[in-house]
Amino acid sequence: MHSRILFKGTAAAVAARRIRHILGPLMSKEGWNCSAHEVKLLNTSSGDTVKIGEISYVLKTPKNPELVPVNHMMEALPQMVTQHLRWIMQKDLLGQDVFLIGPPGPLRRSIAMQYLELTKREVEYVALSRDTTETDLKQRREIRSGTAFYIDQCAVRAATEGRILVLEGLEKAERNVLPVLNNLLENREMQLEDGRFLMSAHRYDKLLEEHTKEELDAWKIVRVSEDFRVIALGLPVPRYKGNPLDPPLRSRFQARDIYYLPFKDQLEHLYRIGANVSAERVSQLLSFATTLCSQESASLSLPDFPVDNLPSALTVLNLFPMLSVQQLVQRLYPYEAMLGKEGRTAVEGVLNRFELTDGSTKPSPTAVVNIEPVNGGQAEQAAVTLNITNQKITFQVPSGTRPIRPPNSSPTFINTPTHERLLAEMMQSHLVKDICLIGAKGCGKSVIAREFAEMLGYSIEPVMLYQDMTARDLLQQRYTLPNGDTAWRASPLVTAAQEGKLVLLDGIHRVNLGTLAVLSRLLHDRELDLYDGTRLLRFDRYQALKEELQLTDQQLQDRSIFPIHPSFRIIALAEPPVIGSTTQQWLNPEILTMFLFHTIKPLAKAEETAVLQGMIPNVPGEAVEQLQHLTHSLRKSNDPTALSLASSLSTRQLLRICRRLSQYPQESVAHAVHKACLSRFLPSLARSSLEKSLANCSIEDHPDPASEQKQLYTCTVKDGLLTIGNVSAPVYSPDEKMKVPDVLFYENVQHMMVMQDMLKDFLLGEHLLLVGNQGVGKNKIVDRFLHLMNRPREYLQLHRDTTVQTLTLQPSVRDGIIIYEDSPLVKAVKMGHILVIDEADKAPTNVTCILKALVESGEMILADGRRIVSDALEAAGRPNAIPMHPDFRMIVLANRPGFPFLGNDFFGALGDIFSCHAVDNPKPQAEFAMLKQYGPDVPDAVLQKLVAAFGELRAMADQGTITYPYSTREVVNIVKHLQKFPDEGLANVVRNVFDFDSYNKDMREVLISALHKHGIPIGAKPTSVHLAKELPLPDCKMTGYWTISQGGNTRRKLLCPTETHRIDIKGPVFLRVQSYPSKRHESRSLSFTEEQAHWQIPMNEVNIVCDVTTAKDSIYVATCNPVSLYAMKEKGDSVQCIELYDIFPRTISGVWQPFVSVAALGNPLQDQVVLHEEQGNTVLHLDLVTGAVRRLILSQDKQDEAPRKTSNWWNSKESQPGYKMCKEFAHKNWLLFYKENGNQLDVVDVLEGQVHTIHLPINLKAVFLVAEDRWLLVESKTDRKFLLTKPMHMGAEETGVCQLHAISEDAVSSGFGNNSGMEAVSPQEVSSDQLSNENLSAALGQKIVSPNRILCDTNTYANVIVGFPDLMSPNELYSFRRSLPITESRRPDMFFGSSKRTGPAKRVNCVCLLDANQVVRALPPTQVPLAEVYPKDVTPPMSAAYLEVTDLNSKRLKYIPVPRSNSMSPYTVWISKVSDTDVVMAPLGSGGVVTVDMGGYVRLWETGLDHLQRSLLEWRNMIGSEDGRPVQITIERDSGLDVSSPKHGKIDAKNAPHVGGNQWAGGTGGRDTAGLGGKGGPYRLDAGHKVYQISQAEKDAVPDEVKRAARDMAEQAFKQRLKEIEMSEYDASTYDRFSGAVRRQVQSLRIILDSLQAKGKERQWLRNQALGELDDAKIIDGLTGEKSIYKRRGELEPELGSPQQKPKRLRVLADVSGSMYRFNGVDGRLERSMEAVCMVMEALESYEHKFKYDITGHSGDGFDIELVRCDKVPKNNKERLKVLKTMHAHSQFCMSGDYTLEGTEHAIRELAHEEADEHFVIVLSDANLERYGISPDRFARVLTSNPQVNAFAIFIGSLGDQADRLQKTLPAGRSFVAMDTKEIPQILQQIFTSTMLSSA
């Protein structure tokens, strides 16, 4: 088992080795030179001789005996070691240099030292690291009293003095450093920097024969001693990490494999140590260790077991024989923390094999019971008593120099059983070795280490490690003395070693292993050689040396030899290695040998609660409970997303949350969690996962408090007290006023909330971290915050090249002395200022992590040897300590993590030591208010548009549709521009922001569509005004009179009795008011038309719109299948909907189709409407705010009527009479109801709650409320008209009687009273108010003042009745006649042929706009003179209707087409009953109408002329008045200059036009003389002629033939490309259908992949270069004149032996089952899946090295249908189309059935076997899981069955809420439901961006 060697030697060598092992002890001496050798020391006259076996070596007396290693020999030398020593002696006698190679551990060094001790040789030891340079080996310059001179370094010293040079860690040194030694090794020659030349002893002695020593000295030749040898120690590199040996270097060494000691020797050694432990356990332990070091375990990539640490483990076991071996193994080899699943199973298997799994049965120590100091002896010791299974065992451990503190006496440390046990275990390890604590960030490593130190009376020396730390930073740094001499300063680590402190190496996982290697000798042997030649020895060796040489301490110190204090110990703190990642495997075999490891497990729930409540006694208990529930549910999850969230909720973060809740108990826990996780900037998956976890733990997410407490967010400074919102703090009075920032800041609610939050945390003493997109005002908020608090600030901006040095001190050279200037950080710490660190994410996280020590412990070591300490008392006694000012705080600003900022993940690395605040763009209202302050003169409409458009763009950026997050900064810049140059158009100014994207086609499309949607006419020209064509209106003629009868006898007859009773109200019932977002599009984005805006109501396709009405700025739409009401604001962005199908059942015994009218009530009943169902005469009153529905029952006698016979109003031949509602005066809260052919009117006063019923002597056809007290009635059958006058107030007069007057109509020709008059026509619409006098005069073409009404009927465009209804004299009727009357029937229907309907449509669609003097009707295209509207060769557009606008002011007629709806209800006949056209219409404001078509599309139109003119002006302003004049550059000169060349020119007396000619004044288009439109003239001079000007458009235009040529060229290339891939044009267009649909997602994915690739290729600093930028760390070396003191950026080659970057592995599992094909017609699911597959193929094209993907299908035929193989991905469009065709064909012809579950299981299983960086499975399925009897939790189990494989499922939504239910049961962030199949590509993009790319 031990014969495995680490080189692939020849088979023969292996065999020989094995046989030697087996036969070694039996063979005779000469057989193998391997018999038992002995080491003898012989004293002879010629000096002492050492004999090993038969080889002897004569000792020489060392010149410097203190440099000879002492105390290294083992008591009993194992045979193996003796053989190694004998071999080294052979090589030494031959004068060869040796290389001891072998696995990591101290054995090789120990053998070398033993040999040197044996042969009494002086040693020069160098630990090579990646920072070693040539100067460390040869010569270093130092400055003494102003001159630089050279000091020999180890190699030169060893060569000249005849010492042995021990080089350890050859694989660590950078390439090309060691070849410096090549010549010294080979020929023992070397040229030195100071001009001397080392020459081998042999040659030197030859020269001496010819020359004198003086001559050689003059030639600067130095003799190399013949005793000089090199012993190199190194690791074999292909197996371990490091640089391989240079072949020329390798050839100069003789190698010897130093493997672990043989089993037998090792066993004997362990038996001696662990006398109390049963022999069997010792041998099992050793067998276990040896197994893990074997070649086989290396192939499993398990790191080697640190065999060399077994003795220390046995020391512990010897004291505590009852301990569990398995737990000890964990300390030596923490396999659970560092290995993946396979590795863990392998290790546990071996443990079982050797019966070592006794972790559960054997006890572990439970607590430290007592600690007391032990007196006597030189070293401080403490007796520690541990409690283990109720036995108390006491043992002695080293202790510190401070007084010992008994356990459990610390006020700040809350003890929990876990921690007590951990401390007890650490005591055991402390007995033998240094400790390393492994635990996640924020779990209390530092706290435990400090508690441990205090218990043992240690002083702590924290050493913060960072990534680009060098070996010098760890051990010794150079500095200059005041006189300019260079000197070395020991690092804190070294001083701590001498003083016996406890060093905390914080962040050992960050530092480079090549640097850490310099500590291995300190950790293993407690010895250290420093750069200036100082040596530190282990205490016992130092004592031995002192006694042997009889020297005093002082003498030894003069020879720079110092002891290491026996109490000195190191505790390393590290985060666990990331299992499976390639980067962070810091726990390698080398480090395993250095420490004993203790992992800190996350606390159990009860213990953590105890800690939280112990630390913060007054925190609300319920909050803690909720937090704990959430945190532990996240930690227990095996979902990587959940675990990453859990890491944000570390114990430290929980303590912070609790501290805050204890101060502000009214805050919600959800808010705190969102803040801690920074949920605003999480990828969408993680955010949904977090929200789901919060919901599962029933943590309520309270609504945004901003809406509730608007009035609270103000800030005031009063009597030295600052109040923000409801938090107050005293204002600071600083010494330095000038450093307090003062900034232009406009307050808004949202920023005040952030500041209030910041103030809360600030008062709690937290350091703050503000994270947000660019330009959201982080800097402004902070400056404003500090301004309000009156705190001075120091400002530090980080960038890519920030180093730890620049963060703390800036070195500079002055007069040859290095001066350190304090950075803002140090100043802020000293003075108590606030340090603002900007752009923190730009600096590498390894740099910024030094802030951690500063925040956490308030300690930090500066480059010049000073240190910051938190405790002022501690600083008092120490000269170089800077006490941290109590007022010092840090505020860090960073951009949001992740794409597109590409910063470093500052939040991920350091987020939990700051209190985090997400800063977002202000909410629309807040942003609007703020912009208003920046641009007070910019019109509100423009600001609203900007705010809305940018709001939408930001939402898109959050979803990942666009990559750049547009911020407030951009909008503010636009507004500032508009404020200063108001004439520039908005459309032009926004280009300042969007021109960045003008070359990216997809991006440009998205932007333009978003801007157009909000009415920013980017791209429109001032000429694109497309208003409808105007036609002349026929002349206005007086056509007749209306006379109101006054006859006395008829008057009595026509009195109408009225009665009044209360309304019977049933209800209310409360229905849900649902709010849907409306995608409101401004229509005037590219051209100016009458249409203002349009949007779609979210209604079902089969629903039918049957009425629309408006009130102020609200629009109400009623639909009748099912009955629902939609309400929206004219400018709003949401639609409220109440569905009333519970109240109107679909049928009452038959096919009953409801038909609804709606009336909007006025003040004080705003937002309330009355719905009237015309058949059942149901009247409902709805409150749209509360959702209350009440039924108003009008007549008492109607209720007991028998149910009517069933009918449906669109089938019966005889139209069933319906009930009608007149709503002209609904805004006054009264309505009138009547029944067709009935003879009574019901007047409902909604406010009073009364009904007045009026009985009439006639049967009604129609009622028009022409005034509040005068109503026009039309009699049915005869169409005769009557005027009903009523007293103004019902019931005010006793009579309460209404009078009815008949109206006679007369034609113009005959005289009065002649009843032969005109035939009676029923009017369609009569206005309820009169035209203003100007409008009336304009309409009739004569000045006139009179009451009037507009009346519309089918024969005329409009009629004006002058004098009606107030004057009793005959009223004149003026008409604008039509040539053809409007017919009332629709054309035969396209689908259903000519289903004739009887009677007119229900909706007349005629509106009178009195202010605009217009009548607007909606007409079907058949009724429109299209030939006159459109030119001959233009085909009229397909339209739903035309709006006919009759303008009585301009006497013009316009026809405006209303675009067709996208979707049409199948119930065409029913629709034809509603309206003659496909729209219904209502007036909107005073100059416009709103139309709603049958597809539910709402359009707003502006028809009034003055409205249109005003809008056109605004629109032109928005485009900007680029009037085509060339821009002139004018330089105004002072008059003193000679202006001769431009002249005024001659004045022509005749003033004839002159064009050009450089002669006449007042010309046009010339040069040099004054005139218009020319160039170079002195000024403009207009002589009144037409200006000849080339139009700007013409100048800019590209000639047509050029355009044509370009188009042909593109087409040619396209065809050529198709030909190459043999694709037909039809195929190309088919493929384009799929690829075009996902082009945008593909684009954005590729952008992200590219940038990731770029980020991965980011260059690193290469140090020790001969050119580049000066490296701060090397300034002193620069002073002394060294060459390689520069650093430059370069590609860092990956270290050899570091694992290869493997590609990520993706499998897409597409559903190609029959149902996909079957339901494709419904929602296009198959096509969407094909698009998704197309997207994967296109996005990952040419990234095959990073993503290996394949695509398989699952259907009823099986679960593994191959579509794309990962080794044969489609290369071009043809191959991709083939894949898509296969999918389509398969789903068309496959069996039914569902294999989603099996397919997913199979894919996950198969992928897990493959080698990859990460594994992803994405399942697309329309699985109706319940139908196939699959329970969702089974599916959930499959998705998470293998933690290595990230599986996601996208369900194509199916019936009802099934998909949502499914999503609730499946793990969060793992399953998506695409109810709308268009979302599939977006979801896929989300998955890609948030997971694959998080770690790429």
UniProtKB/Swiss-Prot annotation:
Region feature Disordered, mapped onto this chain: 1536-1564
**Where is ATP annotated to bind?**
439-446
Give GO MF terms, alphabetically: ATP binding; ATP hydrolysis activity
Q: Enumerate the UniProt keywords alphabetically.
A: ATP-binding, Mitochondrion, Nucleotide-binding, Transit peptide
Residues forming the VWFA domain are 1705-1887
* Effects seen without this gene: Morpholino knockdown of vwa8 results in retinal pigment deposition, damage to photoreceptor cells, and significant narrowing of the retinal photoreceptor layer at 5 days post-fertilization (dpf). Mortality and morbidity are higher in the morphants compared to control embryos.
Listed under GO cellular component are: cytoplasm; mitochondrion
Cellular compartment(s): Mitochondrion
Gene3D superfamilies reported for this sequence: P-loop containing nucleotide triphosphate hydrolases
Q: How does it assemble?
A: Monomer.
GO BP terms, alphabetized: notochord development
- Pfam hit, one: AAA_5
Keyword GTP-binding on entry: no
Function, as annotated, reads: Exhibits ATPase activity in vitro.
| Keyword field contains Nucleotide-binding | yes
Q: What is this protein called?
A: von Willebrand factor A domain-containing protein 8
Question: Which residues constitute the organelle targeting sequence?
Answer: 1-18
Origin organism lineage: Eukaryota, Metazoa, Chordata, Craniata, Vertebrata
Tree of life domain: Eukaryota
